[in-house]
C-alpha cells in the first residue's frame, strides 16, 4: 500500500513540475510578450502605435474616453502597453508603477 501511495505522489509531482516547466518555456519564447514600440521615440509613429494599442486595451472599458486618455499618456511615457483589456501589467513595469497624485494606479 505504501508503495502505491509513493508512486502516486511521485507521478503527481512529475506532472506538476513538467507543466510548470512548459509554462516557463512558453513565456520565455514570447507567447505573452508585449510588442515593442516603434524605433522612432517621438512623433506620429509612436502616436499611431499607442493609439492602436490603447484601442485594444480600452475596448471593454466603461469610460472609454478616460481610459484612452490615460492609456495614451502612459504609453507615450513608457513606450509600452500591456496586452489584453485588464491586468498583465507585469509586462510593462513603467506602466505598472505610474501613480496618480492620490497614489492610485494611473494607467488603465
From Swiss-Prot:
Alphabetical UniProt keywords: Disulfide bond, Gibberellin signaling pathway, Secreted, Signal
Compartments, as annotated in UniProt: Secreted
Pfam families given in the database record: GASA (PF02704)
Record-linked InterPro entries: GASA
Post-translation changes: Six disulfide bonds may be present.
A GO cellular-component term linked to this record: extracellular region
One record GO biological process: gibberellic acid mediated signaling pathway
Annotated signal peptide: 1-23
The organism's place on the tree of life at top rank: Eukaryota
Membrane-spanning residues: none
Membrane among keywords: no
Protein family per UniProt: Belongs to the GASA family.
Function description: Gibberellin-regulated protein that may function in hormonal controlled steps of development such as seed germination, flowering and seed maturation.
Name of the protein this chain belongs to: Gibberellin-regulated protein 7
The organism of origin for this protein: Arabidopsis thaliana (Mouse-ear cress)
Amino acid at each position: 500500500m505504501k508503495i502505491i501511495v509513493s508512486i502516486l505522489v511521485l507521478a503527481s509531482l512529475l506532472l506538476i513540475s513538467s507543466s510548470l516547466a512548459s509554462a516557463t518555456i512558453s513565456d520565455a519564447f514570447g507567447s505573452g510578450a508585449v510588442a515593442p514600440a516603434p524605433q522612432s521615440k517621438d512623433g506620429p509613429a509612436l502616436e499611431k502605435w499607442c493609439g492602436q494599442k490603447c484601442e485594444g486595451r480600452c475596448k471593454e472599458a466603461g469610460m472609454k474616453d478616460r481610459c484612452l486618455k490615460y492609456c495614451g499618456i502612459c504609453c507615450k511615457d513608457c513606450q509600452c502597453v500591456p496586452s489584453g483589456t485588464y491586468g498583465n501589467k507585469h509586462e510593462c513595469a513603467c506602466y505598472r508603477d505610474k501613480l496618480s497624485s492620490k497614489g492610485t494606479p494611473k494607467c488603465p
